[in-house]
Amino acid sequence: MKKTIEVFLRHCYYSKLQELPDRTRPSWFNKHRVFENFKNTLNSELVNYTIVYDEFYGSIDKTFLAQEKNVEIIRCGSECDSFLKTLDIIQSRNFDDDQIIYLLEDDYLHRSGWSEVMLEGFALDSKYVTLYDFDFFINAGFLCETFVTPSSHWRAVPATTNTFACKYKTLLEDLEIHQKYSIDGIKEEELFHFSRDYDKFWELQKNQRYVISPMPGWSTHCDANHISPVIDWNKVMNETNFKNEGKKFTLKY
């Protein structure tokens, strides 16, 4: 059954990016609970999701995702390659032009109602929507246009991370740009490869392909150095109806 939003959620058994010195998790962070939060806050009448799981470092069978049904297995080992493979998977689905595609990384926490808020963002006729209120662009001298929808204020932002939403037609039109900044990603050492997402959205903006984000955010990157402001995300996590609390799973990151 067709749903308005198709989510492609990238997971992996282990990410070497967690070894970088600037990658710090909040004290409340837990990958299993973040996934449960995602499932329990989406509107199932609006959203389908596909897990794109990278088994380069280990099998999905060793994780809390072992019983998930809609899974695409890849073996990449780096953020750049997994993003490029996810783009291939999306293209293979041959969606309608107006299908909303949400490319989501596995360390984003959501507030209830995010599905509806995402649709409000697209009602503003923006090419790209992020639910993450990236604090990098606060008090930084950036001028922006602001908007309002029934549930939120919005602002135009210069860039965002590789978690974003757009329509399928937009993704295809901009595909070469998305590919370029992952093919030519940041490569600090073997498998420490990650996309130049910031640079990518700057180029898209120059082509008048703008991205907007809500204020405050309806999601946050679970990076202790860049949490979406205003919202108590620890409270959001604790309010999640987390099932299987007593089960033990292995996940190496």
Where do the model's predicted regions map?
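A structural signal for short, well-ordered beta-strand segments and their strand-loop junctions
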Residues: F8, N48-Y53, L103, Y128-L131, ...
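N-terminal anchoring/stem segment of glycosyltransferases
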Residues: M1-S78, Q91-F95
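Active-site nucleotide-sugar/metal-binding loop of Leloir-type enzymes
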Residues: T86-I100
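Short, solvent-exposed loop/turn segments at secondary-structure junctions
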Residues: C12-Y14, F56-S59, E79-C80, D106-L109, ...
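A short, glycine-/small-residue-rich helix N-cap motif at loop->alpha-helix starts
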Residues: G77-K85
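Conserved catalytic core of nucleotide-sugar-dependent glycosyltransferases
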Residues: L109-Q179
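Short beta-strand-to-loop acidic/aromatic patch adjacent to the donor-nucleotide binding site
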Residues: D97-L109
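C-terminal catalytic/acceptor-binding lobe
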Residues: M1, P26-S27, Y168, E173-Y253
